Amino acid sequence: LSYFKWNNSVKFLDKYLEQKKQRNLEGKETPLPPKFIMEILDNAFIEEDENLQEIWAQLLINWQDPEKVLDRKYMYIDILKNMSPIEVKMLEIISHSVDYNEVKNNENSYYCKDSVLKCIPMSDNEYEIMMLNLFRLGCCESHRIPNSGVMMGNMPIIPNLGTKQFRITALGYNLIESCIKK
């Protein structure tokens, strides 16, 4: 176990230093609270998935970049450590999509299950579990149909479309900006 953690720490450090060099950040880093640094490093060192290890490095780099104005909160660390590689992959694909900013700024836009399954092959059950975890973490929410005309007394009932159509939440977009966008 110690060797595994040591080996991962070396891999992480290589990724971190390479990204820092590419972005010309050496000596310009914004200091972070030790609590944040320790938690990021602890999670990166035990991470088996190379892509997730890269995401941890990206989070640390982005938060240290003085030119990036990001929401540096502990909750993003906690959310990331509760995500699977496939959930991160989906957010990565969305973050690189051509219509990323358009969908982000239009509350009537949404992503659909079929589009996700074209990019990431998985079973319906795997998709459902992935989406329910992203809902649980607050990164996504079901697309809601406004003005459905259905009322319960004086209260409108706004139906949602479950996991078939979804939106990224403000929390999800902040997570993307913190650890996926370079």
Identify the meaning behind each predicted range.
Residues 71-120:
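Short amphipathic alpha-helical interface segments
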